[in-house]
């Protein structure tokens, strides 16, 4: 069978998910008899290799070949942020006036094990005419994907680069350098906060090594939705993990901060596809979570392990309740799940850099239907109690509209924050 392109794959996945939703699968799955049959069906389709190592079976397929993405032979002896390799990128669709380099650096995962992470540095060729060095924006994109081909460093070289909200061209027009970390890490651990923080901070360290002229640049971090996870966690972890790095500030919007809230707002609802993807992403950093997957859930995880965002989001049309796919009742209340939820709730310590948080608010119009505002306002309060300088802005719109509505204000905040550092 020929390999499907990402748009075709997304269309088929969306169609299948829609059909499942129309058929009332969400209701049917709540039947124990139906789940037994589905688990039996899935069990017969598992390979011996998948049975032998269930954790390995849900990891993303490595990018093949001996090139840039080949695993480094040995990371011992490397310091976090040390550059392993770097290469220039020529996109299939040429973009005049910019230079693109992607690089791999040493980092650590959630458990503290050495891992390689990748990032992309996009620089205007025009000389910087302002005072001081050229400003840098660390743009943490909402990758929201499980497959390595969806990482920004891979997409940008293939002319299928996606930026949501579309800040990148506006930042380059201001003659800023833009760093794009692959913040989900080498396992595409979507939604895992500590891994994302390490990937971002070590990418910044690596940037200062391949572009030493940017080492003293005023720098801000930015991210929305899945990218906000990386931004918030990097801001919180910076004083402990990378205290030598200086940031002028960080801005994050539509931030998922509390998976207990997301379990109520997304699971079994239109956001169930991305909630399921985030669950798989967390399991890649917390292998004990795989013990909770029933055979049907595990089989699905092996099927979608390389999917990008569109088909994962479209799967929400089926409105599947993940709780019924587990091997135990109320899996979200289990010690394993609660430990992961607690470990991925920011607020235990406060950032030292100024932070702007914004969110679609019912107080303005509509409100974010996927990511409840109360999680962000709680984080604002906790960080302020810890001594952080945090500004909060309630903006009109649901999750997608709020991203666009906030853009002018976010760009002004970036400009003012960067100029204040000169």
For every predicted segment, state its role.
Residues 15, 19-118, 123-126, 384:
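Catalytic-loop region of hydrolases
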Residues 38-74, 255-350, 367-370, 376:
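Accessory cap/linker subdomain of secreted extracellular hydrolases
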Residues 109-173, 182-184, 368-370:
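Short, surface-exposed "cap/lid" segments of acyl-processing enzymes
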Residues 163-167, 190-213:
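Alpha/beta-hydrolase active-site loop
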Residues 205-273:
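Primarily recognizes the serine-hydrolase "nucleophile elbow" in alpha/beta-hydrolase
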Residues 351, 357-364:
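Short beta-strand/loop motif that positions the catalytic acidic residue
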Residues 362-390:
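Active-site-adjacent alpha-helix of alpha/beta-hydrolase-fold enzymes
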Residues 386-422:
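Catalytic active-site module of serine/aspartate enzymes centered on a nucleophile-bearing elbow/loop
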């Amino acid at each position: 069978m020929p390999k499907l392109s990402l748009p075709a794959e997304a269309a088929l996945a969306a169609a299948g998910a829609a059909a499942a939703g129309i058929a009332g699968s969400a209701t049917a799955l709540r039947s124990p008899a139906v789940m037994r049959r589905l688990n039996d069906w899935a069990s017969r389709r598992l390979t011996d290799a998948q049975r032998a190592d269930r954790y390995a079976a849900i990891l993303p397929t490595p990018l093949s070949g001996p090139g840039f993405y080949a695993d480094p032979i040995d990371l011992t002896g490397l310091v976090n942020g040390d550059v392993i390799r770097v290469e220039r990128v020529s996109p299939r669709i040429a973009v005049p006036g910019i230079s693109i380099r992607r690089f791999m650096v040493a980092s650590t995962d959630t458990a503290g094990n050495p891992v390689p992470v990748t990032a992309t540095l996009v620089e205007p060729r025009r000389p910087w005419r302002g005072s001081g060095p050229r400003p840098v924006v660390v743009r943490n994109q909402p990758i929201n994907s499980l497959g390595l081909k969806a990482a920004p460093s891979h997409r940008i070289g293939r002319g299928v680069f996606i930026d949501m909200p579309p800040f990148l061209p506006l930042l380059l027009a201001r003659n800023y350098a833009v760093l794009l970390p692959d913040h989900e890490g080498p396992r595409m651990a979507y939604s895992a906060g500590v891994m994302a923080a390490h990937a971002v901070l070590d990418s910044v360290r690596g940037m200062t090594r391949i572009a030493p002229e940017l080492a003293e640049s005023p720098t801000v971090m930015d991210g929305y939705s899945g990218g906000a996870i990386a931004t918030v966690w990097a801001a919180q972890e910076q004083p402990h993990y990378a205290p030598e790095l200086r940031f002028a500030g960080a801005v994050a919007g539509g931030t998922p901060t509390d998976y207990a809230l997301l379990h109520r707002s997304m699971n079994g609802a239109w956001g169930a596809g991305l909630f399921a993807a985030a669950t798989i992403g967390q399991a890649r950093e917390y292998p004990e979570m795989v013990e909770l997957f029933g055979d049907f859930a595990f089989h699905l995880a092996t099927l979608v392990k390389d999917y990008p965002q569109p088909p994962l989001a479209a799967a929400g049309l089926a409105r599947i309740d993940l709780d019924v796919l587990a091997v135990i009742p109320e899996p979200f209340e289990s010690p394993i799940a609660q430990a992961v939820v607690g470990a991925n709730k920011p607020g235990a310590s406060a950032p030292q850099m100024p932070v702007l948080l914004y969110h679609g608010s019912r107080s303005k119009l509509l409100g974010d239907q996927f990511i409840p505002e109360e999680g962000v306002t709680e984080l604002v309060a906790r960080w302020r109690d810890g001594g952080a300088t945090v500004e909060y802005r309630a903006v009109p719109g649901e999750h997608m509209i709020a991203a666009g509505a906030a853009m002018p204000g976010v760009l002004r905040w970036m400009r003012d924050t960067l100029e204040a550092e000169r």
